[in-house]
């Protein structure tokens, strides 16, 4: 529930990619025999080179693993179990055409899925994208450059000679809504974005830095504001290719002037709650929209944070 106070509020909903819909069954990652035993009846998620999957009627389309091979290939990653205990694996492979013409299947990447997916599908696609992206770029050890091979059912890679094991890298980043504690919030437009497209301020956490310190530093660097009372809201995996977005809100002073020193931000402005509500009512980002303010798509934690603040009274 959203707090009615303008100074503090909570997320009204869990971001799509943060929802839990499948059992990760992580114990099976170290018991490859047990994981492989479920292969004959397992489901297979194909993710192509453009990180697209097949989706129909709000669900990701899963094939039969046994049609790919009689056992899990080395490059397959184990995603867990869905309802009924069925195992699900993912591979980087071309998408298979659907034989049934009555199934309205389309190839969509994770950014374009929006709210068309159920919780289980979003979790499976998010995990598969993150893991497969990592495997694509981690075939050699970060320690000594030696070739590595998949282990733990795709959740790590090992140097077969030394036994050195490496795990998927995650890059934490903060994302923050700056508001005045009353009726206004800051939204900014990156230099690479079209006119009217605004979102929250975000940036990667540096070595030796806390999330809260990162929030203050990034906002100061990007728009020149000094913020205080930084408060945590929630988090969301963002596998593009390997980020974890950690959401906050913080107080800022509308009388302080903006400054843009690092070149990332083209403009920033204070928007009233009514202006944001009107933009939300107009829908997701779209250059064809007639809205004066275009906001992030529904898949992002930025959208959920903005919606939650806008709902405050």
From Swiss-Prot:
Cofactor note: Divalent metal cations. Mg(2+) or Mn(2+).
The protein's name: NAD-capped RNA hydrolase NudC
Quaternary structure annotation from Swiss-Prot or TrEMBL: Homodimer.
Cellular compartments per GO CC: cytosol
Top-level taxon: Bacteria
Residues engaged in binding substrate: 111, 236-243
Known role: mRNA decapping enzyme that specifically removes the nicotinamide adenine dinucleotide (NAD) cap from a subset of mRNAs by hydrolyzing the diphosphate linkage to produce nicotinamide mononucleotide (NMN) and 5' monophosphate mRNA. The NAD-cap is present at the 5'-end of some mRNAs and stabilizes RNA against 5'-processing. Has preference for mRNAs with a 5'-end purine. Catalyzes the hydrolysis of a broad range of dinucleotide pyrophosphates.
Gene Ontology molecular function: any one: RNA NAD-cap (NMN-forming) hydrolase activity
Pfam family, one: NUDIX
Chain span(s) of sequence motif Nudix box: 203-224
Catalytic reaction equation(s): a 5'-end NAD(+)-phospho-ribonucleoside in mRNA + H2O = a 5'-end phospho-adenosine-phospho-ribonucleoside in mRNA + beta-nicotinamide D-ribonucleotide + 2 H(+); NAD(+) + H2O = beta-nicotinamide D-ribonucleotide + AMP + 2 H(+); NADH + H2O = reduced beta-nicotinamide D-ribonucleotide + AMP + 2 H(+)
UniProt record similarity statement: Belongs to the Nudix hydrolase family. NudC subfamily.
UniProtKB keywords: Hydrolase, Magnesium, Manganese, Metal-binding, NAD
